[in-house]
């Protein structure tokens, strides 16, 4: 049993058993119905907290990976556009030079 935020909590399953106070006193000891103003907070065992931390790290890593992937895709598209523009520029230049090289009749 653990006393957290004014509630006596079972460490095994996180179930709220009773209200508790400064010296692990319970409602029966104080003869009060309501002592704490905070609602019962579900107790989460440490092993689950660690799992959630790892999962959150994984999610953040996945988000960062997706962002990098999108940046790479944008760069590739930009380079393709540049190459396409460059090819059209080259084609225009070669046409112009061909016109200059061919004799007029």
Curated annotation (Swiss-Prot):
Domain of life: Viruses
UniProt protein name: Uncharacterized protein ORF105
Species, as recorded: Acidianus bottle-shaped virus (isolate Italy/Pozzuoli) (ABV)
Organism ancestry: Viruses, Viruses incertae sedis, Ampullaviridae, Bottigliavirus, Bottigliavirus ABV
């Amino acid at each position: 049993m653990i006393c957290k935020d004014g509630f006596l909590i079972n460490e095994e399953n996180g179930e709220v058993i009773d209200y508790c106070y400064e010296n692990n006193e319970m409602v029966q000891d104080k003869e009060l119905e309501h002592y704490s103003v905070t609602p019962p907070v579900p107790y989460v065992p440490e092993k689950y907290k660690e799992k959630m931390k790892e999962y959150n790290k994984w999610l953040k890593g996945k988000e960062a990976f997706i962002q990098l992937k999108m940046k790479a895709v944008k760069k590739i598209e930009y380079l393709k556009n540049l190459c396409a523009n460059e090819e059209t520029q080259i084609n225009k230049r070669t046409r112009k030079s061909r016109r200059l090289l061919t004799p007029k009749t």
